[in-house]
From Swiss-Prot:
Membrane topology: Peripheral membrane protein
Any single Pfam family the record assigns to this protein: EF-hand_1
Assigned keywords, A-Z: Calcium, Cell membrane, Copper, Cytoplasm, Cytoskeleton, Immunity, Inflammatory response, Innate immunity, Membrane, Metal-binding, Repeat, Secreted, Zinc
Annotated organism of origin: Bos taurus (Bovine)
Residue span, EF-hand domain: 13-48, 49-84
Role noted for this protein: S100A12 is a calcium-, zinc- and copper-binding protein which plays a prominent role in the regulation of inflammatory processes and immune response. Its pro-inflammatory activity involves recruitment of leukocytes, promotion of cytokine and chemokine production, and regulation of leukocyte adhesion and migration. Acts as an alarmin or a danger associated molecular pattern (DAMP) molecule and stimulates innate immune cells via binding to receptor for advanced glycation endproducts (AGER).
Gene3D superfamilies associated with the record: EF-hand
Record-linked CDD domains: calgranulins
SUPFAM superfamilies reported for this sequence: EF-hand
Chief location category: secreted
Binding site for Cu cation: 16, 26, 86, 90
Intracellular or extracellular location(s): Secreted; Cytoplasm; Cytoplasm, Cytoskeleton; Cell membrane
Domain comment quoted from the record: The hinge domain contributes significantly to its chemotactic properties.
This protein's name: Protein S100-A12
């Protein structure tokens, strides 16, 4: 497997590590999303310990408004984080 393929698989595995805890095995509820963000992206996403911030992120990601974040919706967060990281790298 290439380095990129390995990282892609890692993103999928991290999602599944949190999505299988409660409810549907392939979606994140608000609590699971908060746990994933605070444990896996603590330096990347600021102010994620306060509930209003988590509520806003969840609301933005839950495109179909079903009360859960699917993998497809989670990829939007990953994409935003990658774009920001890319911009930040060029600032250094």
């Amino acid at each position: 497997m290439t380095k990129l393929e390995d990282h892609l698989e890692g993103i999928i595995n991290i999602f599944h590590q949190y999505s299988v805890r409660v409810g549907h095995f392939d979606t994140l509820n608000k609590r699971e999303l908060k746990q994933l963000i605070t444990k896996e992206l603590p330096k990347t996403l600021q102010n994620t310990k306060d509930q209003p911030t988590i509520d806003k992120i969840f609301q933005d990601l839950d495109a179909d408004k079903d009360g859960a974040v699917s993998f497809e919706e989670f990829v939007v967060l990953v994409s935003r984080v990658l774009k920001t990281a890319h911009i930040d790298i060029h600032k250094e």
